[in-house]
Amino acid sequence: MMQSSLARPLPRPPIRPACGNPVCRSRPGSVSVARCRAEAAPPAPAPAARRAAGPYTGRDPEVKKPAWLRQRAAQGEKYARLRESIGELKLNTVCVEAQCPNIGECWNGGGGAGGEGDGIATATIMVLGDTCTRGCRFCAVKTSNKPPPPDPLEPLNTALAVASWGVDYVVLTSVDRDDLPDGGSSHFAQTVRALKELKPGILVECLTSDFRGDLEAVSALANSGLDVFAHNIETVRSLQRIVRDPRAGYDQSLAVLKHAKSCKEGMITKSSIMLGLGETDEEVKQAMIDLRAIGVDILTLGQYLQPTERHLTVREYVTPEKFQFWKEYGESVGFRYVASGPLVRSSYRAGELFVQNLVRNNKPKLPASS
């Protein structure tokens, strides 16, 4: 009797190789699967060529980051306490937003990122939100044409936080707010007044925008009770349009600093320059002379560090010895205080004792009562 075709055993389905190789006979779980996968894998694509440094941005493979720029990760009791307080009150700091390399040292009170220090802690609070209306090519702060409106509770929350820290010196800074009629000057001034009301003896430094050159806005802030008016020219004249947003400018910044100086007797003014962007020594000297010509008292100089490849290319890592040269040169042309070093930033240890004494001694003396 012929066997019915229905009774015949069905053919086995083909084994699907676990490795994906159609000629592989290894079953799932076989020890040879991994080897087979490696053998059958298509060749890895050639690595993409490094993007060549553009005229302004990108990484320059010829410029290597030196050892003197290495920093320990921030830690320490004071650092942890400040970070917690800032988070609870929903405050912004330029230390975090701008990826400052000195956050551990400053928040711990100078001396080191690990918590050892001299007790002079400096935290730079960023008011008017964390979103800037400008797009400077060196800056890591996020940007938008329409940032959220300022928090009306921010001046009070900032004052409460700073008063609870027990510090004697605080730096307030802000993003640029070209969307506001006065550039945020009145909000800035409210914060200063709230601080002075809660802690009358505190010294307040304000690192400001240029308020689009609005000198009335400069006056409103300069007369709010602050002790140091700081505004950065950022770089030498020839690099302004490359480094800064087109709405900023060298002469506009000088005008802001000059006007702030004239607003109040005893006003201390301050500015900062980044190095490593391709400036020449003669250009740096001229920038210092220009600042001294309008009476700027304090100058900081630091190394520009590129946040991402989309930001300006580092053209040079300036040596600590050259920074020492600039410190001595700055003092020789008349600055009352110069902080100069690879990791120095605008607010670097702003409240150290020398600066505190400079500010206090520069205040106009009240006439003696008869």
Curated annotation (Swiss-Prot):
Cofactor dependence: [4Fe-4S] cluster
Pathway listed: Protein modification; protein lipoylation via endogenous pathway; protein N(6)-(lipoyl)lysine from octanoyl-[acyl-carrier-protein]: step 2/2
Top-level EC class as recorded in UniProt: transferase
EC number from the UniProt entry: 2.8.1.8
Record domain Radical SAM core: where: 115-336
Binding-site residues for [4Fe-4S] cluster 2, renumbered to this chain: 132, 136, 139
InterPro entries: Aldolase_TIM, Elp3/MiaA/NifB-like_rSAM, Lipoyl_synth, Lipoyl_synth_chlpt, rSAM
Region (Disordered): 1-25, 39-67
Presequence range in chain numbering: 1-37
Protein's GO biological process: lipoate biosynthetic process
Residues given in the record as [4Fe-4S] cluster 1 binding sites: 95, 100, 106, 347
Keywords, alphabetical: 4Fe-4S, Chloroplast, Iron, Iron-sulfur, Metal-binding, Plastid, S-adenosyl-L-methionine, Transferase, Transit peptide
PROSITE patterns: RADICAL_SAM
HAMAP family, alphabetized: Lipoyl_synth, Lipoyl_synth_plantC
Family affiliation: Belongs to the radical SAM superfamily. Lipoyl synthase family.
Protein name from the UniProt record: Lipoyl synthase 1, chloroplastic
Name of the gene encoding the protein in the UniProt record: LIP1P-1
